[in-house]
Amino acid sequence: ANMNITFKLAEKGPQGEATTGILYHRLESGFGNYYAPRMALYAWDNHKYMNVYVMNDLYGDGVTNNSGVSWYPDIEMTDENLARVVYNGAYIGTNTDENFRRVLTHEFGHFLNLAHTFDDNSGAWPDGCNLNKAGEPNPGDWVEDTPKADQPLMGATDRNCEGDLTNWTNYMNYSYVRTSMFTKGQVDRMLDALDHSARIELWQ
């Protein structure tokens, strides 16, 4: 499904100055952590700008293969200029395979309130794989038209515990193959997220 949303680089900065929307800062890391004190030096007003930080070491721990991270709409994060998407620059464009090039789309999905298709089943689960790690029914991504995935990296012929084929090309899955789509229900959820108090001023 097509949500008809366009993301554009800012043309006007916080003080009204002309900008390309791209700023370069050397040797920064760790903005993938919830609180990153140095981020305050660079953050633009989260009510007016969607901040995307591109770096190689997302968590400041020397690990450079984490692909990306973002957070669901949260007015407290927006008020504190903590709302953001953080993306590993090593995976931009032709630097990597097609699957990792779509990580930014995946993280934008989280920014607009989409969960993974496998919810929190990213590790071991109890007997009865339709249960999550807490032993509760797995809600998938809370979107009715997205088949639940019992775990990440389910493929084209894999079925979930309800017998449904998984939506393996969904952007909110993890996959070693090309992800390429959102369901209509996911699009509706993202459009609803645009009216959240943490996001609405970005487009109004």
How would you describe each model-predicted region?
Residues 1, 76-79, 163-164:
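Short, conserved catalytic or adaptor-binding loops enriched in Gly and charged residues
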Residues 1-48, 195-199:
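Propeptide-to-catalytic entry region of secreted or membrane-anchored zinc metalloproteases
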Residues 3, 46-48, 81-83, 168, ...:
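Residues that flank catalytic or metal-binding motifs in active/ligand-binding sites
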Residues 16-19, 60-64, 95, 179-182, ...:
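Short, solvent-exposed loop/turn elements at domain surfaces
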Residues 31-119:
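Active-site-proximal segment of zinc-dependent metalloprotease catalytic domains
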Residues 92-181:
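The catalytic-center signature of Zn2+-dependent metalloproteases
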Residues 176-204:
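Pan-zinc metallopeptidase signature
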